Regions:
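An N-terminal assembly and electron-transfer interface module characteristic of large anaerobic redox
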Residues: 1-264
């Protein structure tokens, strides 16, 4: 076992005939180090490993910051005194820059649910309809209740069955069955409109192409809020720019790390 913390994780040490060793199955960078923890040279290796870890860019943290930051948008022609609740769940972990910017560009206020915690998870457990559904789906129920406590006017959670994809395989266009179907589950299991008198907007979208998305979004916004197609299309363009900025910043950060690895 690894002796460098109280966990004493098991690891595999392969020793070669030339005296070299190779460590595998270690849980962290400390597990790669061999030797007595009391030895000064070993302690120095541990300190170097810790320093290296702290200097390594945390791309997951950066992605989360970029996902939920505010992107630029022009002032809407008409401010709408409606707060749209967006739960930090499922596909929103890919599309949040688009949706927050889209709603703000149309003059709506936005309220996100808090980041997931054990309390949020436990708050929604009573509404989970299946023990076998994935953990991210179980979290949705708690996030809805979190938005209700925040006093939102409406909750928006679209059911998007198909999206365009960077992957050229035709099957990659279809969303995960749970992701695209869970808004329907929520409407029946939690029933926000009946339970909390909060409209739960879960429009069904089939976005095979950009044109489909634009047409369906303009139709939905005109029917639900009386917003003109021209105004919605303008908001879509602004939201697209925000989403592009999100991806561009992630690509730049990833490339910087790869360039550093290649250089070293």
């Amino acid at each position: 076992p690894c002796p460098f913390c109280a966990n004493h994780c098991k690891r595999t040490i392969v020793r070669f005939s030339n005296g070299n060793s190779w460590v595998t199955n270690n849980r962290c960078e400390r597990g790669e180090i061999l030797g007595d923890p009391k030895d000064a040279s070993v302690r120095q290796q541990l300190a170097d490993a810790k320093k290296s870890r702290e200097q390594t860019p945390n791309l997951f943290k950066l992605r989360q910051e970029l996902l939920f930051k505010d992107y630029p948008y022009p002032k809407a022609a008409k401010e709408r005194d409606i707060t749209i609740g967006l739960p930090r769940v499922l596909s929103y972990w890919e599309t949040m820059p688009f949706w927050t910017t889209f709603w703000r560009a149309l003059g709506f206020k936005i309220q996100l649910s808090d980041l997931s915690t054990r309390k949020i998870y436990e708050d929604g457990l009573s509404a989970v309809t299946s023990d076998t559904v994935c953990f991210p789906a179980k979290l949705v129920h708690g996030h809805l209740r979190n938005l209700v406590k925040k006093g939102v006017d409406r909750i928006f959670m679209p059911s998007i069955t198909t999206v365009t994809s960077e992957n050229t395989e035709s099957t990659s266009e279809s969303m995960c069955a749970i992701v695209k179907g869970y808004p329907i589950v929520i409407r029946n299991s939690d029933n926000p409109e009946k339970r909390w008198h909060i409209p739960f907007d879960a429009p069904l979208f089939h976005w095979y192409k950009r044109e489909d998305r634009n047409r369906q979004l303009t139709g939905y916004m005109e029917k639900t809020f009386g917003i003109s197609p021209a105004e919605t299309r303008q908001a879509i363009n602004v939201a697209d720019a925000a989403e592009k900025q999100f991806h561009d910043e992630m690509h730049r950060a990833g490339k910087a790390v790869l360039d550093e690895v290649t250089a070293n």
